[in-house]
Amino acid sequence: MNDVYKCPVCGQLTESPTHCGVSAVKILDGAMRLKISKLLSLALRHSPSVLGLSLDKGGWADVKTALEGLRKAGIRADYEALYAVVALDEKGRFELKDGKIRARYGHTIDVEVEYEADSESKVLYHGTSRHLLPSIMAQGLLPMRRRYVHLSPDFATACQNARRRPLPVVIEIDAECLRARGYVVYAASGKVRLAKHVPPECLKKVVDCPTPS
């Protein structure tokens, strides 16, 4: 992950070392940003006890407790660092509100997060590995241990996800097909869409991810 800077003129957080025509102040290095993000994902999605958290029904945890948990894990993070991780996350993984923090999606634990329905997207994408295609084409996309299937609104994001595995490919999905079969498509963030299941008949085609230049 990139370093995070704060502009001394306007106060905006940025990944650029310059802003408003002046040098910005580095407040968080990329390595620490990644560590915080990974620990928050683990605790808020799967295992709250990792940071000593207690989640309510909506998946919210106390920010002060989260910061204390990070410190006990050897990460000296203050609220500004935590806010930077949340605010600059390109996939909108986290949410801060009224002294609480939660993961927006990706849970394997039993929480209830309300999402707005996406009624506009016509095509969605899912990044995966070519060797998984036979089972996907037979069963469709299943949430597995998660509560929802994760989909992307654009090809590039799906490819980015697919490249975590060997032989990355992207499956193109007919979103109207999903709706016609009674499946709601939810917008979890600007970069993430969710559905309970994607049946085989809604899978349109498979495209290889291009090699990054």
UniProtKB/Swiss-Prot annotation:
One of its GO terms (biological process) is tRNA splicing, via endonucleolytic cleavage and ligation. It comes from the Archaea. Its EC number is 2.7.1.-. It is an enzyme of class 2 (transferase). Transmembrane segments: none annotated. SUPFAM superfamilies: ADP-ribosylation (SSF56399). The keyword NAD applies. The keyword Transferase applies. GO terms for molecular function: NAD+ poly-ADP-ribosyltransferase activity; tRNA 2'-phosphotransferase activity. Keywords: NAD, Transferase. Removes the 2'-phosphate from RNA via an intermediate in which the phosphate is ADP-ribosylated by NAD followed by a presumed transesterification to release the RNA and generate ADP-ribose 1''-2''-cyclic phosphate (APPR>P). May function as an ADP-ribosylase. HAMAP family: KptA. Belongs to the KptA/TPT1 family. This is Probable RNA 2'-phosphotransferase. The lineage of its organism: Archaea, Thermoproteota, Thermoprotei, Thermoproteales, Thermoproteaceae.
